[in-house]
Swiss-Prot record:
UniProt cross-references to Pfam families, sorted A to Z: TatA_B_E
Region (Disordered): 81-102
Natural source organism: Paracidovorax citrulli (strain AAC00-1)
Primary location class: membrane
Transmembrane parts of this sequence: 1-21
SS bond partners: none
Protein family according to the UniProt entry: Belongs to the TatB family.
Domain of life of the organism encoding this protein: Bacteria
Protein name (database record): Sec-independent protein translocase protein TatB
Subunit structure: The Tat system comprises two distinct complexes: a TatABC complex, containing multiple copies of TatA, TatB and TatC subunits, and a separate TatA complex, containing only TatA subunits. Substrates initially bind to the TatABC complex, which probably triggers association of the separate TatA complex to form the active translocon.
Cellular compartment(s): Cell inner membrane
GO MF, any single term: protein transmembrane transporter activity
Amino acid sequence: MIDIGLSKMALIGAVALIVIGPEKLPRVARTVGTLLGKAQRYVADVKAEVNRSMELDELRKMKDTVETAARDVHHSFQTHASEFQKDWESGTSDAAATGHDGILDPAALEGPSSRIVPTYKHPGKNWRLKRSATPQWYKARAGVRTKAQSGAARVARFRPRKFQ
């Protein structure tokens, strides 16, 4: 911002002390500091706004390129779809002209592509059955709680009995 060294600051302070006087100098210094802070904040806000506008311009350019790419893909897809539709219609019209009804003979179905592939079915294990299959002696050794008990009931159960 402004390049002011220590000697220049001392000179400015001495001149201000002589011109303004010792009584008004602290108030003037506070006012100058406040105004300088406001100026710095204003400059920072302007910089941020310029950066934001530059980023928005870049984003708009990116958006335009993405939109043009999407339009190109959509156009190519439409052309391929229309070509496929024309080929399909010509193929079905040829089949209708030859008298082929579209039903294949069983001999044509034989081959590797006609095999039925079974689908995977998850076994659907029941977690209750798994837990009950664990032996009780193992649960006792491992410290697995089989009965739920509240905290107060547990304290009452393990509290030493009073002597009478």
